[in-house]
Structure formats: C-alpha cells, structure tokens
C-alpha cells in the first residue's frame, strides 16, 4: 500500500489542531486554506476559552460545565460528546498554557478565569481580549514543527471546490483552485477533514470575516453530506453597528462588569439585571439578544430612537480595562472615536455564529465515508444556542477528535487513494474547470454583489432574532428568485489570475443553497428553542421537536429534504430554561 495521507481544509483552530494530532501519529498532512492560516477567522475571537479548572474554589467541575452547556443549548445537543468535551477542557487549557499561550494570570501566578454568559462560575481562561489570536498563533507554531519535519505541507491561497468521491461515494481526495494563477488541481488523500468555519456572510453584514461564506460546507452538502440544525444561528447581543460590517464587542466586557442599559422615563434602565437577577448581564446570548431587540424594536427605547443600547464600562478602573480588555477598547476607539473608559459604548445585536453545520457522528465523521468535519462547520456541540467561550473549546476539541479518528479510519482502509485510477481525479477536475469556464463567460445584466446584498437584507430581516412563518416562506421565494437571477450575472472582470469577483460569484451560488436549508429548517420547526424564536410558537416543544434537523440536498433548484433524528438526552433530563433564578446544584 502506498504512503497514506490526510487533507485538512481550513487553517483555523479546528484545522490546525486536527493537523497537529494527525501529524503526531506520523501521518502526512496537506493543509489547505483560502487565506494564510494566521488570517483564519479564529484570529478574531476575543473573550476566552472555557474549562472547569476551578482555581477560584467555586465548586466548579466538568459536570457543571457540561450541564451549563446542554442547558444553555436548550437540550438540542447530543449529550455524550458534549460531556467528553467538557471533561477534556481543563487539560486542553493546560496544553495551550504549555504551548506558550500568554494567558492572563492572577497576582499569585495562577491562570486567571473570567465569568461568561450562562454560568455562575469563573471558568473562562483568556489572553486579554485577543484570545483567538494567541491560540491560533500558538497552534501554528506547533504545525510549523511538523512542516520542518516534512510531515505537513501548507497550501495557502487555495480554495476548496469539492471532495473527490469514488463509485462507492467514499471520499478519496479534493479538488482545489490556486487563487493566484486560477489553476484547478486534484489532490489524493485517504481522509479529508473539513474545518471551514461558519456561513455568516449569507446574512450580509455580520461579525464574521468576509471569507466565512459557508461555501465549502455547502459544496459537500450538495455532494450528499447531511447539514444539521442549519436554522440555529447565533445573534451576538453586543456589536458595533457599521455600514460595512458589524464589529464584535466581546461578552468579556460584561464578564468584567460591563452593564447593558438604556434610558426609560429619563432614567438609566438596566433591563437585563432587572429581569434576570441571578445572571444579570451574563444571561445566554439568545436571551440577551431578544431583550435588546425587544427594547429597541418593540418598545422603541433605543438610544435617541435608534436601534442601539449602551454597554457601559465607564465605572471600571481604566488600568484594569487596558489589561483585560485592551483588544476591544482599541477596536471601539478606532471605529467609533469614543473612549469606552469614559463613555458607554453603543451596541446592537449582530449575526455571529452557526450552531448548525455538517452532520457528524461521535467520531466527527460525516455520512460520507472518509469525510470528517470539525469546528464551527460541524453541528455537534452547541445545540440550539452556544455559550460564550465554548466556541474556541469546541473548535480545538473537534480537531483533537477528528485528527486521530481520521488516522484510525485511514489505517483501516483496504485500498489507498494513491491506488485509485487517475481518471477518477481527472473527471472531477474537468467538471470544476467547466463550471469555472461557465462563470467566467457569464454575460448578463445582474451583479453578484447586488444579489448578495439583497440576500443578506432578507435573511437578516426575517431569519434572525424573530421568525414568522409567512416571512420565512417569502424569504424562500426570494432565494429562489435570486437563483434565477444568478443565471443572468455579468462577470465584467475576466482576469485570468486572482479573480476576486468570479470567485465570489461561485461562492454566492453555494451560499444560496445553504440559505434555503437555514430558512426552510426554521419554517418547519414550529417551536421556540435557543436562538430559534417564533412568537406564534413561544414555548419549547420537546414532544415533537427534541430532534436534530437533517437537511439532504436533492437538486440545485429543489427544496432540501428534511429528516429528523432524536437527540441523545441520556445523561441529563431536559428541563425548562429559567435564568431569573440561580441554578439548583445537581
């Protein structure tokens, strides 16, 4: 048998951790990224990473962390993998510490932990307000050790175009495009790990990087992978409104004592503290977002009648703010011109994260043999709503599980991708070259960026904080209209190298497919759970909807087929969420 290898698509935390774990066992890894890996969206994460290390003597434990996570996710997550993640969390934090991550420390020299939403405990390890950057850089240093050893090869500036599937629908490699010279090539591999992040750009403006189109996940969904719980999109309660994008103001601002308020009857009204005395400003994100939305949109009590409320840190010690929140204070000063140490920040909710993603089993493998997924592009850990600072944990943990399981899968194969006929790979390349030629020759009257703006406006208006069935159906009609208009796009720039417009057009067609999964998944789910809220169905309905949504692609112009899979609630019995009272110890 020839030399086996694994391909990892995506260079964020999940992709880098999967690469490290696979290379650790001596497996050759090709790492593909659409941007230099240090620019992956993980670099934008601010607040921290959760783990019940319990240095504060609060009686915290991995079980408490597990309970907070499934409770915060409104019981839609399968419990065994979540429990395993929470049990691994303290050792992941210590591993990162040993890798040299500059975590903040207490005066005694212990790791410091801050409080985040949906918990009563201080369990979030952090490196100022740039935790994602510090973790990403530390993991990249480890990957570079394996690069030097000849085990890892990086392909930065390559876009994933599809998995190579053989006659048995088993994954045997990928097709990718070099974004400098636009050459399309195939790469053989015995397993592929998708770590391509979320689809925030489907909503137009979001807190996500412009590369987070969901295009790669959409491609493998169109190739037959199930897409699970797509309708669960997290809207972060605190972001700076902007004309181009929405800039995240981390939950750590509230974790360090920031207060959310607006004026009511001429006096400051701390509405979260009033309604949820036990958790105050640190209720889970879906709840904080709905309250801010209600205050601004329904009660018309936003600042000066605009859709904004205050996030106030001005009562805190400025020196402490610089040490613990320097990253976000700098961002706010740069883009708003005000000093958050002296004046309250103005914020409003923004599309932030997808709890849904590619369906995976407990080994992080999709329903396509040999195709794994980890990080935000898989659905497995967060149920109906993610707790703050669980994303960095789930990305790293997902990579830690996917890497070794991909190696195990490869070692159990009878035939290697290297033994496959080259005609299989040539056929996949030819198909992608034809698609690219079709895009480059588009000569209609529509503009892909205008169509994308329309999609974003419709999705943000109707498929975010509050959802109504009639509006969801109209949104689906709009997506189908955009699919028709897509055929009439004009590619004015036919440059043969580094062609951004044509690239975006191709990604946009994939975004439209996922937009239907999100919209119709939301339409079908007649209940309110986590981030999915329907005023016409205000209660959670476990009898009918304690189920994972699984979308299956039919054809480009047909609606997806939906199946539903029971959630594994074997460890903690579902109970109603109530954040106005403290959690009763179990």
UniProtKB/Swiss-Prot annotation:
<dbReference type="InterPro" id="IPR015939">
    <property type="entry name" value="Fum_Rdtase/Succ_DH_flav-like_C"/>
</dbReference>
<keyword id="KW-0472">Membrane</keyword>
<dbReference type="InterPro" id="IPR036188">
    <property type="entry name" value="FAD/NAD-bd_sf"/>
</dbReference>
<dbReference type="InterPro" id="IPR011280">
    <property type="entry name" value="Succ_DH/Fum_Rdt_flav_su"/>
</dbReference>
<keyword id="KW-0285">Flavoprotein</keyword>
<feature type="binding site">
    <location>
        <position position="386"/>
    </location>
    <ligand>
        <name>substrate</name>
    </ligand>
</feature>
<dbReference type="GO" id="GO:0009061">
    <property type="term" value="P:anaerobic respiration"/>
</dbReference>
<protein>
    <recommendedName>
        <fullName>Succinate dehydrogenase flavoprotein subunit</fullName>
        <ecNumber>1.3.5.1</ecNumber>
    </recommendedName>
</protein>
<dbReference type="InterPro" id="IPR037099">
    <property type="entry name" value="Fum_R/Succ_DH_flav-like_C_sf"/>
</dbReference>
<dbReference type="InterPro" id="IPR003953">
    <property type="entry name" value="FAD-dep_OxRdtase_2_FAD-bd"/>
</dbReference>
<feature type="active site" description="Proton acceptor">
    <location>
        <position position="285"/>
    </location>
</feature>
<feature type="binding site">
    <location>
        <position position="250"/>
    </location>
    <ligand>
        <name>substrate</name>
    </ligand>
</feature>
<dbReference type="GO" id="GO:0033765">
    <property type="term" value="F:steroid dehydrogenase activity, acting on the CH-CH group of donors"/>
</dbReference>
<feature type="binding site">
    <location>
        <position position="352"/>
    </location>
    <ligand>
        <name>substrate</name>
    </ligand>
</feature>
<dbReference type="GO" id="GO:0006099">
    <property type="term" value="P:tricarboxylic acid cycle"/>
</dbReference>
<keyword id="KW-0249">Electron transport</keyword>
<dbReference type="GO" id="GO:0050660">
    <property type="term" value="F:flavin adenine dinucleotide binding"/>
</dbReference>
<keyword id="KW-0813">Transport</keyword>
<feature type="binding site">
    <location>
        <position position="376"/>
    </location>
    <ligand>
        <name>FAD</name>
    </ligand>
</feature>
<dbReference type="InterPro" id="IPR030664">
    <property type="entry name" value="SdhA/FrdA/AprA"/>
</dbReference>
<comment type="similarity">
    <text>Belongs to the FAD-dependent oxidoreductase 2 family. FRD/SDH subfamily.</text>
</comment>
<dbReference type="GO" id="GO:0045121">
    <property type="term" value="C:membrane raft"/>
</dbReference>
<comment type="pathway">
    <text>Carbohydrate metabolism; tricarboxylic acid cycle; fumarate from succinate (bacterial route): step 1/1.</text>
</comment>
<keyword id="KW-0816">Tricarboxylic acid cycle</keyword>
<dbReference type="GO" id="GO:0008177">
    <property type="term" value="F:succinate dehydrogenase (quinone) activity"/>
</dbReference>
<feature type="binding site">
    <location>
        <begin position="10"/>
        <end position="15"/>
    </location>
    <ligand>
        <name>FAD</name>
    </ligand>
</feature>
<dbReference type="GO" id="GO:0000104">
    <property type="term" value="F:succinate dehydrogenase activity"/>
</dbReference>
<comment type="subunit">
    <text>In B.subtilis succinate dehydrogenase forms part of an enzyme complex containing three subunits: a flavoprotein, an iron-sulfur protein and cytochrome b-558. Interacts with FloT.</text>
</comment>
<keyword id="KW-1003">Cell membrane</keyword>
<keyword id="KW-0560">Oxidoreductase</keyword>
<dbReference type="Pfam" id="PF02910">
    <property type="entry name" value="Succ_DH_flav_C"/>
</dbReference>
<dbReference type="InterPro" id="IPR027477">
    <property type="entry name" value="Succ_DH/fumarate_Rdtase_cat_sf"/>
</dbReference>
<keyword id="KW-0274">FAD</keyword>
<feature type="binding site">
    <location>
        <position position="236"/>
    </location>
    <ligand>
        <name>substrate</name>
    </ligand>
</feature>
<dbReference type="Pfam" id="PF00890">
    <property type="entry name" value="FAD_binding_2"/>
</dbReference>
<feature type="binding site">
    <location>
        <begin position="391"/>
        <end position="392"/>
    </location>
    <ligand>
        <name>FAD</name>
    </ligand>
</feature>
<feature type="binding site">
    <location>
        <begin position="33"/>
        <end position="48"/>
    </location>
    <ligand>
        <name>FAD</name>
    </ligand>
</feature>
<dbReference type="InterPro" id="IPR003952">
    <property type="entry name" value="FRD_SDH_FAD_BS"/>
</dbReference>
<dbReference type="GO" id="GO:0009055">
    <property type="term" value="F:electron transfer activity"/>
</dbReference>
<dbReference type="GO" id="GO:0005886">
    <property type="term" value="C:plasma membrane"/>
</dbReference>
<feature type="modified residue" description="Tele-8alpha-FAD histidine">
    <location>
        <position position="41"/>
    </location>
</feature>
């Amino acid at each position: 048998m020839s030399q086996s290898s694994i391909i990892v698509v995506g260079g964020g935390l999940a992709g880098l951790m999967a690469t490290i774990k696979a290379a650790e066992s001596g497996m050759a890894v090709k790492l593909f990224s659409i941007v230099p890996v240090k620019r992956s969206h993980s670099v934008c994460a601010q607040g921290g990473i959760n783990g019940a290390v319990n240095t504060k003597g609060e009686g915290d434990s991995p079980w408490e962390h597990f309970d907070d996570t499934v409770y915060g996710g409104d019981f839609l997550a399968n419990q065994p993998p979540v429990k395993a993640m929470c049990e691994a969390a303290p050792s992941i934090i210590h591993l990162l510490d040993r890798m040299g991550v500059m975590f903040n420390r207490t005066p005694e020299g212990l790791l410091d932990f801050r409080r985040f939403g949906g918990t009563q405990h201080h369990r979030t390890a952090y490196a100022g307000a740039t935790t994602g950057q510090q973790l990403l850089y530390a993991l990249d240093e480890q990957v570079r050790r394996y690069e030097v050893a000849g085990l890892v090869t990086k392909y930065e500036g390559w876009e994933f175009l599809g998995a190579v599937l053989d006659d048995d629908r088993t994954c045997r490699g990928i097709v990718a495009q070099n974004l400098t010279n636009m050459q399309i090539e195939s790469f053989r591999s015995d397993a592929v790990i998708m770590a391509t992040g979320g689809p925030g750009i489907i909503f137009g403006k979001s807190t996500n990087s412009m590369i987070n189109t969901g295009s790669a996940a959409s491609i493998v969904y169109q190739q037959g992978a199930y897409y699970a719980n797509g309708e669960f999109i997290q809207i972060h309660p605190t972001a700076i409104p902007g004309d181009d994008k929405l800039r995240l103001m981390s939950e750590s601002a509230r974790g360090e004592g920031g207060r959310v308020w607006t004026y009511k009857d001429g006096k400051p009204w701390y509405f979260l503290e009033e309604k949820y005395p036990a958790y105050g400003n640190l209720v889970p994100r879906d709840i904080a977002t709905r309250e801010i939305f209600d205050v601004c949109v329904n009660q018309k009590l936003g600042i000066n009648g605009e859709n904004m409320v205050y996030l106030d840190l001005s009562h805190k010690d400025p020196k402490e703010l610089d040490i613990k929140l320097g990253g976000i204070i700098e961002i706010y000063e740069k883009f708003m011109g005000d000093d958050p140490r002296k004046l309250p920040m103005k914020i409003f909710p923004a599309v932030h994260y997808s709890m849904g993603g590619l369906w995976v089993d407990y080994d992080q493998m999709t329903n396509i043999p040999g195709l794994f997924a980890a990080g935000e592009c898989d659905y497995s850990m967060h149920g109906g709503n993610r707790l703050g600072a669980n994303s960095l944990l789930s990305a790293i943990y997902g990579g830690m599980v996917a890497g070794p399981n991909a190696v195990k899968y490869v070692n159990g194969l009878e035939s290697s991708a290297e033994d496959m006929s080259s005609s299989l790979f040539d056929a996949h390349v030819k198909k992608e070259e034809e698609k690219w030629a079709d895009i480059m020759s588009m000569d209609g009257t529509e503009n892909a960026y205008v169509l994308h703006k329309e999609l974003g406006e419709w999705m943000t208006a109707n498929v975010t904080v509050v959802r109504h069935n009639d509006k969801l159906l109209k949104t689906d009609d709009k997506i189908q209209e955009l699919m028709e208009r897509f055929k009439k796009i004009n590619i004015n720039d036919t440059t043969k190298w580094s062609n951004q417009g044509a690239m975006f057009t191709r990604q946009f067609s994939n975004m439209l497919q996922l937009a239907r999964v999100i919209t119709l998944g939301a339409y079908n789910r007649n209940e309110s759970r986590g981030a999915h809220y329907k005023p016409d169905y205000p209660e959670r309905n476990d009898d009918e909807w304690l189920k994972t949504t699984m979308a299956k692609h039919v054809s480009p112009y047909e609606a997806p087929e939906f199946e539903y899979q029971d959630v594994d609630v074997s460890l903690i019995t579902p109970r109603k969420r109530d954040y106005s009272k403290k959690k009763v110890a179990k």
